[in-house]
Amino acid sequence: MRYKMKVRFKYYEFQGGIYQTCGVYESDNEENDGVITDYLSTIPGSYADNGFKVLAAVKDPTITRDWISSQAFDALIEHDQIKVGFYLLDDMEEEDIPDDVDERDTAPRFIPRKEFAYLLEKWLDFYHRPITDINYQEIIDTKEAYL
C-alpha cells in the first residue's frame, strides 16, 4: 500500500447531456494522482468494450507486462504496478522519439496494480450504471483494495 488517495466519481451536465467524471478527492500526491484519474476517465470511451478488456488484463496475474493505453494516455502494466503518462518512452529507440516531445510529458506516474484494478472496477460500475440522480457521487478510497 502507498500513500493516501481518494477518488470522487460524479456526474456533470454539459450542453444538454449528462456525463460521468472522476477526479482526485484527497491525495498526498495530487499531481501524480490527477494524471491517474484523468487516464481512468478516458478508458471507457477508448475501447469498443468500454474498458472491460483493460480490467481483465489488470486483474490477470499471468500478465506481467502489457500496454493498456487509452486515446489520450499511454499506460503500461509492469508487474505489480501501472505506469501512466502522456507519452511513455518504453520500448522506443532514442532515434524514434520525436524532437518536439516535452520531457514533462514523458514523466511516468505510478499506481499499485491492485489499487488500479480496484479503482477501474469501481469506475466501470459507476460509468455503466443508469443515471437516476445527477447529484449522486461516490468517494472511493484506494486503501479499500487491500481489505
From Swiss-Prot:
It comes from the Bacteria. Belongs to the UPF0275 family. This is UPF0275 protein PM0504. The lineage of its organism: Bacteria, Pseudomonadati, Pseudomonadota, Gammaproteobacteria, Pasteurellales.
